Curated annotation (Swiss-Prot):
Origin superkingdom: Bacteria
Gene name of the record: tal
This protein's name: Transaldolase
Species of origin: Nostoc punctiforme (strain ATCC 29133 / PCC 73102)
Gene Ontology CC: cytoplasm
Subunit structure: Homodimer.
C-alpha cells in the first residue's frame, strides 16, 4: 500500500502543527506546535475554547487584586492566555510548543528579554521545563540580540518573521535554537510585485529562499534548526521535504494526509556540504545594509509586525469585552 505525503514527509522532516486549535492538534498528532498572536486570537474566538479564555480572565482578576482596573486585568490575562493555550497543547504533543513575545516589543531588546523570561516563569510554575518551550521573537536586529542572551540563559528561541539570508545568518551566529523562514508570505510579495498569478513550486521565491538558508546552515555546520513556515500550497511543502522541521496549517496537513504520491527528499545536508557557497559574517552595519537592500524582507518584516500587533489589539479588545460580560454574570448571579 502506497504511503500518503504526510507519512513520507514525517520520515525526513519533523512535522509541526501551525495552529492554536487544540482539536486540530489532537487529530494530526504533530511532534511540535507553533502559535502566534493571530492564531491565539482566532482560537480565543472559537466557542470550544471559551472556557480557557474565561478561566484565564477570572484568575487574572483574582490575582490583580481588588483595586485593579479593567486594563490591568486584561493586560495580565493577555500575557497568560498564550501560555494557557500552550499548556493545553503540551498535554497532547510529545515535543515543544512555540509561544510568541508581544510583537510590539520587536525593536526593544530589554523589553523582549523581560517578557520572554516571564513566559518561561509561567511555564515553570505549571511544571513545564525549558526544553519543551520555544520563545518566538521577530527577527529584527534587536530581537536577535535578545535571543542571543536568552539562549545563554538556557531559554530556547524560535526566530520568526524571517524573510532574508541576512536575518538567518545573524540568527545562526547568535546561536539561536531554531528559525522560522516564511515561504508563502515571500510568494505573496513577489506575486504582487511582478503581477504574476502563480509560480511553479520549483521557482517559488519562498521555496528558493528557504532552500538557500538551509544549504547555508548545513554547509557551514550551524546547529540552528530550519523550520519552514507560512505555506500557501502543497507544492511549497513538497519542495522543502528534508528541512529540519516544517510547520503546517491544519488544512494543508489534511491535504498532505489525503494525497498518495511519491515524495522525493529535496533538502539534504550531504548535498548542501558539496555546494560552493561564500561564508559571510553579519554585524549591525551589514545587517542594516542588507536589510535595506532587500525590499521584500523590509516590507514583509514591517507588515508582519504590524499584522501581529493588530491581532494583539483585537485580542485585548476581545478580553476586555469578555471581562465585562463575565463581571455582569457574577453580579446577576448574586
Amino acid at each position: 500500500m502506497s504511503k500518503n505525503l504526510l507519512e513520507q514527509l514525517r520520515e525526513v522532516t519533523v512535522v509541526v502543527a501551525d495552529t492554536g486549535d487544540i482539536q486540530a492538534i489532537e487529530k494530526f498528532k504533530p511532534q511540535d506546535a507553533t502559535t502566534n498572536p493571530s492564531l491565539i486570537t482566532a482560537a480565543a474566538q472559537m466557542p470550544e475554547y471559551q472556557g480557557i479564555v474565561d478561566q484565564t480572565l477570572l484568575q487574572a482578576k483574582k490575582d490583580a487584586g481588588d483595586g485593579a482596573t479593567q486594563a490591568q486585568i486584561v493586560s495580565l490575562a493577555f500575557d497568560r492566555l498564550a501560555v494557557a493555550f500552550g499548556l493545553k497543547i503540551l498535554q497532547i504533543i510529545p515535543g515543544r510548543v512555540s509561544t510568541e513575545v508581544d510583537a510590539r516589543l520587536s525593536y526593544d531588546t530589554e523589553a523582549t528579554l523581560t517578557k520572554a523570561r516571564d513566559l518561561i516563569a509561567q511555564y515553570k510554575a505549571a511544571g513545564i521545563g525549558r526544553d519543551r518551550v520555544l520563545i518566538k521573537i521577530a527577527s529584527t536586529w534587536e530581537g536577535i540580540r535578545a535571543a542571543e542572551i536568552l539562549e545563554k540563559e538556557g531559554i530556547h528561541c524560535n526566530l520568526t518573521l524571517l524573510f532574508g539570508l541576512h536575518q538567518a545568518i545573524a540568527c545562526a551566529e547568535a546561536g539561536v535554537t531554531l528559525i522560522s523562514p516564511f515561504v508563502g508570505r515571500i510568494l505573496d510579495w513577489y506575486k504582487k510585485d511582478t503581477g504574476r498569478d502563480s509560480y511553479p513550486a520549483t521557482e517559488d521565491p519562498g521555496v528558493l529562499s528557504v532552500t538557500k538558508i538551509y544549504n547555508y546552515y548545513k554547509k557551514f555546520g550551524y546547529k540552528t534548526e530550519v523550520m519552514g513556515a507560512s505555506f500557501r500550497n502543497l507544492g511549497e511543502i513538497t519542495e522543502l521535504a528534508g528541512s529540519d522541521l516544517l510547520t503546517i496549517s491544519p488544512s494543508l496537513l489534511a491535504e498532505l494526509q489525503s494525497t498518495v504520491a511519491e515524495l522525493p527528499r529535496k533538502l539534504d545536508p550531504a548535498k548542501a556540504a558539496s555546494l560552493s557557497i561564500e561564508k559571510i559574517s553579519i554585524d549591525k552595519a551589514s545587517y542594516d545594509k542588507m536589510h535595506a537592500a532587500d525590499r521584500m524582507a523590509t516590507d514583509k518584516l514591517d507588515e508582519g509586525i504590524k499584522g501581529f500587533t493588530k491581532a494583539l489589539e483585537d485580542l485585548e479588545k476581545l478580553l476586555a469585552d469578555r471581562l465585562v460580560r463575565l463581571e455582569g454574570e457574577v453580579v446577576a448571579s448574586h
